[in-house]
Regions:
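Catalytic core of non-heme Fe(II) oxygenases with the double-stranded beta-helix
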Residues: 9, 22-26, 101-118, 124-133, ...
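Short acidic-glycine-tyrosine-enriched beta hairpin
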Residues: 43-63, 148-168
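A short, N-terminal "cap"/entry segment at the start of jelly-roll beta-barrel domains
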Residues: 1-10, 70, 74-115
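Residue-level marker of beta-strand positions
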Residues: 23, 53-54, 128, 158-159, ...
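Glycine- and acidic-residue-biased ligand/ion/polar-headgroup-sensing regions
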Residues: 19-22, 29-44, 127, 134-150, ...
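Ligand-binding loop in jelly-roll beta-barrel domains
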Residues: 7, 48, 59-83, 164-190
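Conserved hydrophobic/aromatic beta-strand scaffold that supports enzyme active sites
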Residues: 1, 13-17, 34, 54-56, ...
């Protein structure tokens, strides 16, 4: 568990591992659920979702999740704006990448709503990005390689959350990096608050 606010029904950010043959009862996500499949195959009422699939199940949506072979998910619960009601299903393995703001940076937008943006960002080896601030904070999950800034080096599996108005100057070394990044959400009015 990376972050949890609340008791039994909580706003949470975590890695969730389904053992092979796992099956859960149908349930409603009253405040929404965001999923990135990291490994294996996650299944629900909408089909089978292999590694690389990004899902947004909006507030009020329901499903019966399962995994025949097992899977590992990055999950964010109860972190939707009340008017963010559009389901999203993106197979990131099939989506095109866009050129980023500097050479060596490629971006795959996943979702944007009221100033909150989520994307995958691919950093080629030895890429530098200018120092910048995040007025609404920033959250990163390192999916591959090593992401770096002046505060440290963050290998695959690292989760970072930087507060509102935090600043950094990110770079990569010889490994490059692939990251999930969300910006603008800290301090925003979300249904799980």
């Amino acid at each position: 568990m990376f972050d949890r606010v609340g008791a039994e029904v909580a706003r949470a950010t975590s890695l969730v591992r389904y053992a092979p043959g796992s099956r859960f009862e149908r349930h409603v996500h009253g405040a929404g659920e965001e999923i990135l499949v990291l490994d294996g195959v996650f299944s629900d009422d909408n089909g089978d979702h292999a590694a690389g699939v990004y899902l947004r199940n909006p507030p009020g949506s329901a499903h019966e999740p399962q995994s025949r072979e097992g899977c590992l998910l990055f999950v964010k619960l109860r972190q939707f704006a009340a008017d963010d009601l559009q389901p999203v299903r993106i197979d990131t393995r099939a989506e095109p990448w866009r050129q980023g703001l500097v050479p060596g940076l490629s971006v795959m937008p996943l979702h944007e709503h009221n100033g909150i943006s989520t994307a995958l960002v691919r950093w080629a080896p030895n890429t530098r990005f200018h120092a910048h601030a995040h007025p609404g904070g920033e959250e990163i999950l390192v999916l591959d390689g090593v992401f770096r800034d002046e505060f440290g080096a963050y290998p695959e599996g690292s989760w970072l959350r930087s507060p509102r108005w935090s600043r950094h100057a990110p770079v990569t070394g010889l490994e490059g990096a692939l990251i999930y990044v969300k910006v603008g959400h800290l301090g925003a009015a979300l249904t799980g608050d």
